[in-house]
Amino acid sequence: MQTKLTQFFKKNTLDKSTTDFQKNETNIEQNNNIQKKTITIYTDGACKNNGKKNAIAGIGVYSENVYNISEKIEGRQTNQRAELYAILKALELTKIDDYSTVYIYTDSLYSINCITKWIYGWINNGWLDKKKKPVKNKDIIQPIYNIYKKYSNIRFIHIEAHTNKTDIHSLGNAKADELATLFNSAINKVV
């Protein structure tokens, strides 16, 4: 009798339902250990006739296989506003929770400093700069900062502009620049 029971259990230990359960258990473990992916986004702003009344500013946002944006900015038309607006647009369109890290590459050290350094002094001073004047571009800086402080997975990385290098980040920056200037070129051709 003992031999028959042993043979029965050996034969039926891995029946279909047991095998299915083991597969499902493995899937659950794998699902619990899924690592989120990262995303790399390149942003750029461009302004033709910067500082003049006839200035036209546009943005370029490039992220391979996710989205590419080329559009004119609203309001005052300056290069710095365009650089900031490109970052804001990228953050607004990205489902930040879907990624372990969101890398924003920009050639605008001004934009990075606004969001990661200078803003703390501005907030403490009631959004006044060192000369006690209202901070320029607050309307764009503040919403970027609000997104930045909400998520701990956003990283800003400064990259050199117009290098003609062929590494992946230089090429990504060139694509963002092309999108920003493409928009300006299209406007100028229509006018």
Describe the residue ranges of each PLM region.
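RNase H-like nuclease fold core
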Residues: 18, 26-85, 92-95, 115, ...
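A residue-level signal for beta-strand positions that form part of recognition/binding surfaces
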Residues: 2, 38-40, 153
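Short linear clamp-binding motif
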Residues: 1-21
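RNase H catalytic domain
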Residues: 46-52, 88-174
